[in-house]
């Protein structure tokens, strides 16, 4: 089936089209957004598929109660309250703008990201090697990110109204010595029960996604990223 991605090859153009359409009512926008991604129209009256149910929730669920979970800074307090400290990467600072960052106070290795979005991670492995051009590139990237309303793109209410920051965390190495970065585990819950998970590897280089059931049986599921060609040590 045709999708917006298959018809419009340029990602910037696709994003521009969706930005132009943001003024339309949420149910219509969500239906167009779903079609653009899947090539099918969602059944928002009687949702059956997982993705349809997520779209239904955007319209009918009080998503504002999840806002602090979507905020990568505030969720740290929630996690600490529920299971104790020691489970989060140490945070080194947060700033309302890139120009507020005191790079002299940061270690040689650290990670930058925004708290209100997805995909804004920058891994700094050698601070001393950063050139003026590198700093300017980071400045443009994060100033642009801090202006983005992440709610508007997919109409996910949990992102609406988050106070935006760029923040730094301690760089963490994989105990196995994998230079591609630490493994990233994500779980997919259906009706409140975890059924599927994926492990992301090589985050710092060429990310791979591998899906498993809850008994760690490898599943033949692909996302936008390829599967790993080597055995994953869980």
Feature roles, as predicted:
Residues 4-5, 15-19, 60-64, 121-128, ...:
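Charged, low-complexity surface segments at secondary-structure and domain boundaries
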Residues 14-16, 32-43, 98-100, 200-212:
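Phosphate-binding glycine-rich loops and adjacent basic patches that engage nucleotide phosphates
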Residues 106, 132-228:
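Phosphate-binding site of ATP-dependent enzymes
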Residues 46-129, 139-157:
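A conserved helix-loop-beta module that forms one wall/lid of the active-site cleft
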Residues 232-234:
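Conserved small/polar residues in nucleotide/adenosyl-binding loops
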């Amino acid at each position: 089936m045709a999708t917006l991605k298959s018809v419009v090859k340029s990602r910037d153009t696709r994003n521009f089209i969706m930005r132009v359409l943001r003024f339309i009512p949420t149910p219509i926008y969500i239906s167009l957004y779903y079609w653009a991604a899947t090539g099918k129209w969602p059944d928002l009256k009687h949702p059956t598929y997982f993705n349809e149910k997520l779209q239904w929730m955007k319209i009918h669920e009080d998503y504002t109660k999840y806002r602090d979970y979507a905020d990568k800074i505030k969720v740290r307090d929630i996690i600490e309250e529920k299971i104790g400290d020691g489970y989060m990467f140490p945070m080194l600072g947060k700033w309302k703008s890139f120009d507020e960052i005191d790079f002299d106070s940061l270690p040689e290795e650290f990670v930058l990201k925004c708290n209100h979005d997805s995909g804004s991670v920058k891994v700094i492995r050698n601070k001393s090697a950063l050139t003026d051009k590198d700093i300017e590139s980071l400045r443009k990237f994060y100033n642009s990110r801090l202006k983005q309303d992440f709610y508007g793109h997919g109409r996910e209410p949990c992102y609406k109204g988050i106070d935006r920051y760029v923040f730094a965390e301690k760089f963490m190495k994989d105990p196995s010595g994998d230079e591609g970065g630490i493994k990233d585990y994500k779980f997919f819950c259906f009706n409140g029960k975890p059924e599927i998970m994926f492990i992301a590897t090589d985050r710092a280089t060429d990310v791979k996604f591998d899906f498993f059931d809850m008994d760690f049986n490898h599943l033949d599921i692909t996302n936008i990223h390829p599967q790993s060609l080597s055995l994953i040590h869980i």
